[in-house]
UniProtKB/Swiss-Prot annotation:
The keyword NAD applies. InterPro entries: Cyt_trans-like (IPR004821), NadD/NMNAT (IPR005248), Rossmann-like_a/b/a_fold (IPR014729). It comes from the Bacteria. It catalyses: nicotinate beta-D-ribonucleotide + ATP + H(+) = deamido-NAD(+) + diphosphate. Catalyzes the reversible adenylation of nicotinate mononucleotide (NaMN) to nicotinic acid adenine dinucleotide (NaAD). CDD domains: NMNAT. HAMAP family: NaMN_adenylyltr (MF_00244). It is an enzyme of class 2 (transferase). GO terms for molecular function: ATP binding; nicotinate-nucleotide adenylyltransferase activity. GO terms for biological process: NAD biosynthetic process. This is Probable nicotinate-nucleotide adenylyltransferase. Pathway: Cofactor biosynthesis; NAD(+) biosynthesis; deamido-NAD(+) from nicotinate D-ribonucleotide: step 1/1.
Amino acid sequence: MKKIGLFGGTFNPLHNGHLQLAEFAAAQCQLDQVVFLPAASPPHKKGDEIVPFSHRAEMIRLACSRNKRFSCNTIEQDLARPSYTVDTLQALKTSPLYKSEAQFFFLIGVDAFIELKTWKAYRDLLSEINFILCPRKLFSRTQTVLFLTELGFVQTPLGWEHSSYLTLYELEGAPDQVSSTEVRRTFEKSGDLYQKLPPTVADYIMKHGLY
């Protein structure tokens, strides 16, 4: 069975940290493919801070072109707004692209994961997809452990297991993550994009005058 990692996010813009994390998760969790899912209208983000979907999707395509395991899926563009992960997952599972059997893994930062109870139908998500928890800079693992325990998960040699939900996995030794917000602030202060972005993405931003 093919193992597909789903990497959802605003990607405003996609940066080197996103790619490094995807590569790390693919290696550690033996993923056959990592699909980047740009959010069309994320419910927890301010719309006036986000560049149009078409630009964000194109930047992802450019960045993924050098890795055959990476791809961009723009399914959220055609779904109801705002973008809810549970709806995106259901649409993906019934799409022609993934109609064959596949095991899905959702990459998520631990800072976002501990807010899971605020997500639409979060119990359905835990029942239908394996989560891969990605560490975040300056974020205590103790908070993650407490939240998982509160949800009823038990840590085992295989991961975090639950009687009703699918197994969760923690990435070990993953690279520290910078945020897209930090990248934008660096650009505002110094005008330097090339340090933290793939060259093709930096070129695209300069060409179209984004941020």
